Amino acid sequence: MQDAITAVINAADVQGKYLDNNSIEKLRSYFQTGELRVRAAASISANAAGIIKEAVAKSLLYSDITRPGGNMYTTRRYAACIRDLDYYLRYATYSMLAGDPSILDERVLNGLKETYNSLGVPIGATIQSIQAMKEVTASLVGPDAGQEMGVYFDYICSGLS
């Protein structure tokens, strides 16, 4: 896992240079939004179950996918979907705090699409649920933090597409 600070420092170090103005500006921006990210993470952590419940209600609960014959029919499959959404929310929050999506590649996306395809998990419905989670989260944390979180939800969706 990498964070915004490590990414900037590593880039300069690889080149054997001091931080340039662009690097300093990236760090300044990261630190200026630090309080916003921490407050958003606290709010998401305190409301994670509600975020997931509302996202499922918006995207999956009344669709064909939850009816007999659907890919989320049976309690076990439904529970696995809820577990995965919780996982995406948690790791998107970690990424938002770090200001870097690398943890999503390392811990979420590597091999996920292939696994879902082999298990018959509908990727379109998964993406729809993540987008619903993005909307619910943005309404909870406000537009600025919601936009920041949206970057990481979109990153997950892009990785699944």
Curated annotation (Swiss-Prot):
Cited function: Light-harvesting photosynthetic bile pigment-protein from the phycobiliprotein complex. Allophycocyanin has a maximum absorption at approximately 650 nanometers.
Cellular component annotations (GO), alphabetically ordered: chloroplast thylakoid membrane; phycobilisome
Annotated coiled-coil segments of the chain: none
Similarity-based family: Belongs to the phycobiliprotein family.
Description of how the protein assembles with itself and partners: Heterodimer of an alpha and a beta chain.
Topological category with respect to the lipid bilayer: Peripheral membrane protein
Any Gene Ontology biological process: photosynthesis
InterPro entries cross-referenced by the UniProt entry: Allophycocyanin_b, Globin-like_sf, Phycobilisome_asu/bsu, Phycobilisome_asu/bsu_sf
Post-translational modification: Contains one covalently linked phycocyanobilin chromophore.
UniProt entry tagged with the keyword Kinase: no
Protein name: Allophycocyanin beta chain
Residues recorded with modification N4-methylasparagine: N71
Main location group: plastid
Signal peptide (residue range): none
UniProt entry tagged with the keyword Thylakoid: yes
Keywords linked to the UniProt accession: Antenna complex, Bile pigment, Chloroplast, Chromophore, Electron transport, Membrane, Methylation, Photosynthesis, Phycobilisome, Plastid, Thylakoid, Transport
UniProt source species: Cyanidium caldarium (Red alga)
Binding site for (2R,3E)-phycocyanobilin: C81
Subcellular location: Plastid, Chloroplast thylakoid membrane
